[in-house]
Amino acid sequence: MSEAKTYDIATMLDELGMTTAALRWKEILSGPELGDYTAQQMLREVITPQYVEMKDNKYRTNLRLSKLVDKTARAENCKTSSGRRYNDDVVQQIFTFDFVSKGLNAGIYGKTGAGKTYLLSAVCDEACHQNYRSLFLDYTDLMDELLVLSQKDDLEKYTKKLKYYSRIKLLFLDDFAISRYSEEGIKVLYHLIKSRTDLRNPTLFTSQYAPAEWGKYLGDEPDCYGKLDGIRRRLATGYTVAIEKL
């Protein structure tokens, strides 16, 4: 292959926006190992740096859009040790992300300080690596926002925002059921959870309270029993992680 033709490839890669691949191609051409590659090895050598860069850029974008607060949380730290006990088999299953295609949820339970938020953050971080559209929110902040919008005369903004949260592929809610709401708040939560379930978009959450206790902590309006039961049945369908601080 002539020098003109080989550098023409670099130009084409540049024009395709594959600058990193073009640079690697030029490095190979000017290096002593040029004749050592098979065609497949050459292609892999040129494309891999571009692919890695693309994946890293996607991860950084996903992480920024996720609004994740603790960006230091990592999956490898979420296993039974001298400080905490997990049901490790379930945690490992969650990190495979098989639950996404099945539309299953994941609840992380434990007392204050058990490490629930850390695990939820680690799953969110890995979801960003896996290129899932993710959003990490405080449960109370989410509910307050939707409740305020639902009480305004212009319901278009409320409907639009509800659809937005419903369509996020993976919604991460920290401290679920930490605040009690009126009948209107329970109605808002019911619509959100039902919509996400219908769309088969998983919701992952932390909570201090078991599903059987949610009725007591989510709201105490007697007319809300049906909606509370609907929330519990839908949201508790999936994986359960219990964290015990030792």
What role is predicted for each listed range?
Residues 84-91, 134-166:
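Short glycine-rich substrate-engagement loop in P-loop NTPases that contacts/grips substrate
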Residues 18-70:
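Interdomain "pre-motor" coupling segment immediately N-terminal to P-loop NTPase/helicase cores
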Residues 132-133, 167-171, 199-205:
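Loop/turn-to-beta-strand initiation segments
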Residues 72-97:
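N-terminal pre-Walker A segment at the start of P-loop NTPase domains
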Residues 1-16, 21-22:
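Charged, compositionally biased N-terminal leader segments and the immediate start
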Residues 124-137:
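Post-Walker A helix-loop "phosphate-sensing" segment adjacent to the P-loop in P-loop NTPases
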Residues 102-119:
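Walker A/P-loop nucleotide-binding motif
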